[in-house]
């Protein structure tokens, strides 16, 4: 059980809880990711039984750390299922890229207006791409794999790397937009000054 009297308890508890979560980043718990859910538990804003991918064993680990009773998975947030990976039907894929954008760990590869595919070894089975696909080209396929702590660690690293890349890309687009806006403003100002000078002459 976590020592609640230690300094920076909430932060340290949230980190410890996060390490016990499967890192699928599925959002079934109602939060944006595993870290956010872990923090909510640490701050007593959420119960420990919202993580369906973690299953009964996951709840037991969270219970042991927090001292809370090991409740059954709350069915409102899903149910424990065998691990499954996403697979895209190439005959249905329209290349819209929505699955790529939805994947929290960068496991979907392809080019806009071309076919996309799932890198199954990187897939966490979150199912977010299934929800994002407008033509039902994505399905979840059970493959007999049992999710491990090593898988969780790899998924967490993939998630953080994907997040960093997307933030950098968004920042670059913002900078480009600002530059384009500044250039347009400069051109407009030059045109106005030229118009004024022509009127004076």
Write out the residue ranges for each language-model feature.
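Short, electropositive, low-hydrophobicity segments enriched in small/polar residues
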Residues: 34, 110, 129
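Flanking helices and flexible, charged tails adjoining ferredoxin-like Fe-S electron-transfer domains
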Residues: 5-7, 77-81, 120-201
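Generic secondary-structure signature for well-ordered alpha-helical cores
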Residues: 43, 64-71, 98-101, 193, ...
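Long, charged N-terminal interaction/targeting segments
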Residues: 1-71
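Ferredoxin-like iron-sulfur electron-transfer modules
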Residues: 11-23, 45-53, 72-95, 100-101, ...
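Surface-exposed charge patches
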Residues: 61, 101, 131
């Amino acid at each position: 059980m976590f020592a609640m009297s230690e300094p920076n308890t909430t932060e340290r508890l949230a980190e410890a809880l996060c390490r016990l979560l499967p890192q699928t980043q599925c959002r079934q718990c109602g939060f944006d990711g595993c870290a956010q859910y872990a923090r909510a538990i640490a701050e007593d804003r959420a119960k420990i039984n919202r993580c369906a991918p973690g299953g009964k064993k996951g709840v037991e680990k969270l219970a042991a750390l927090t001292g809370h009773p090991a409740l059954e998975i709350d069915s409102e947030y899903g149910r424990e299922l065998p691990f499954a990976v996403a697979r895209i039907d190439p005959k249905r894929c329209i290349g819209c890229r929505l699955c790529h954008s939805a994947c929290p760990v960068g496991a979907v590869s392809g080019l806009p207006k071309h076919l996309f595919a799932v890198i199954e070894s990187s897939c966490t089975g979150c199912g977010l791409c299934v929800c994002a696909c407008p033509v039902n080209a994505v399905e979840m396929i059970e493959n007999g794999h049992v999710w491990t702590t090593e898988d969780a660690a790899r998924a967490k690293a993939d998630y953080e790397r994907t997040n960093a890349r997307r933030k950098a890309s968004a920042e670059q687009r913002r900078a480009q937009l600002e530059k384009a806006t500044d250039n347009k403003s400069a051109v407009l100002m030059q045109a106005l000054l030229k118009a004024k000078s022509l009127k004076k002459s």
